A protein has these predicted regions:
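Regulatory input/activation interfaces that engage signals or partners
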Residues: 2-151, 155, 161-165, 169, ...
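PAS-family sensory domains
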Residues: 160, 183-243
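The N-cap/first-turn positions of alpha helices
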Residues: 290-294
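Short helix-to-turn junction characteristic of helix-turn-helix DNA-binding domains
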Residues: 298-302, 341
Length: 343
């Protein structure tokens, strides 16, 4: 087993740093896992580390996009087996569905999503590292094949942290950059079932931008906001999602409408602002709290000596933190760093 785990970890590391896009990332991670945990399909989601909603998605031979709303129902509104939040905080970050145990009889995911689409077993993994959940991964087997075993669940548990770090490496594989767009922000109003009631012109462009590489029709685009709307209704407040795009970062915000019908929400989509994006970037790029303090002052335009006085540290310490920030963000100078963060 040790050799198999080491081989899988090596493949996972290569995928995180070498994947050109989200689709390739998912494909290469699936291939790295296939020796230890054979599967027929997968669904990978990266999560905004602050709001915990899906910010990118990749899958092959997996659940249909429309059925993902039923999957979210099992996470937020009904008590289904192995919700990712429970796996995140539980003793194991791996859960298996489809083993035939009594507790699965009323599973919405098993009966309404998996069975109608020909899947008999699911092994889901909460991709946790450093106390945060960076993504989720569901591995699928077709009906008629053996269920995922306890031994395979143990193998998957060994790969939780490497998989989480691979997602971080993928997002942080190059310096951040502002998304330049002359298009106005999109504003979309949805009802309690997440059907679009009204939208500004050009909204489809922004929805599609949140799914780079997506080739489906416009009627499937609401999958880009479903996780945010479920979370906003659960929290009864606004939910911000920061979406990595090949040309920069996109910011989405879902929030309940005052005085509206039950469940109605407004969703705005636009290029991410520095204020919104910076906390997520510090997480993705592994910035320490002290480095983050220096970074926030630098973004405000303060020179090194003034940053030192404000933070009550030496100028030498400030310079050390700035050098660490240059390395983590993949830039060579302060001007380049600030340009990368000028959203």
């Amino acid at each position: 087993m040790a050799i198999g785990v080491e081989r899988a970890v090596s493949g996972i590391r290569g995928a995180g740093g070498g994947a050109a896009d989200v689709q390739e990332l998912g494909h290469e991670l699936s291939r790295a896992l296939s020796g230890l945990v054979p599967h027929d399909g997968y669904m990978l989601a990266g999560l905004d580390p602050l709001s915990q909603v899906s910010c990118f998605l990749s899958g092959e031979h997996t659940y249909s996009y429309p059925s993902l709303r039923h999957v979210l129902l099992g996470e937020f509104e009904v008590s289904d087996r192995h919700p990712f939040t429970d796996l995140w905080h539980g003793a194991s970050q791996v859960g298996v569905l489809g083993s035939g145990v009594r507790e699965e009889r009323n599973s919405l995911r098993l009966n309404e999503v998996m069975a109608p689409q020909g899947f008999g077993s699911e092994l889901r993994i909460a991709l946790v590292a450093g106390g945060l959940m960076w993504g989720t991964l569901a591995l699928l087997r077709e009906r008629g094949r053996a269920c995922f075993t306890a031994a395979e669940a143990v193998h998957a548990q060994c790969l939780v942290a490497p998989l989480a770090h691979a997602l971080r490496r993928f997002v942080a594989r190059r310096p951040p950059r502002p998304l330049r767009s002359a298009r106005p922000p999109a504003v979309i109003v949805v009802d309690g079932a997440d059907r679009i009631r009204s939208a500004t012109p050009g909204s489809a462009y922004w929805l599609r931008a949140c799914l780079p590489g997506f080739l489906g029709t416009d009627d499937i685009l609401p999958i880009t906001y479903w996780h945010s709307t479920f979370m906003a209704r659960s929290l009864k407040g606004p939910v911000v999602n920061r979406v990595p795009h090949p040309d920069g970062w996109i910011e989405t915000r879902a929030q309940p409408l005052a005085g509206a019908a039950a469940g109605e929400l407004a969703i705005t989509i636009q290029p991410a602002t520095t204020r919104t994006l910076l906390p997520a970037l510090t997480a993705w790029y592994g910035v320490t709290p002290r480095e983050a303090a220096v970074l926030h002052e630098a973004v405000e335009g303060l020179p090194g000596k003034q940053i030192a006085r404000r933070l009550d540290v030496s100028p030498h310490t400030v310079n050390d933190h700035l050098k660490a920030l240059y390395r983590k963000f993949g830039v060579s100078a302060r001007e380049e760093l600030l340009a990368a963060l000028a959203h």
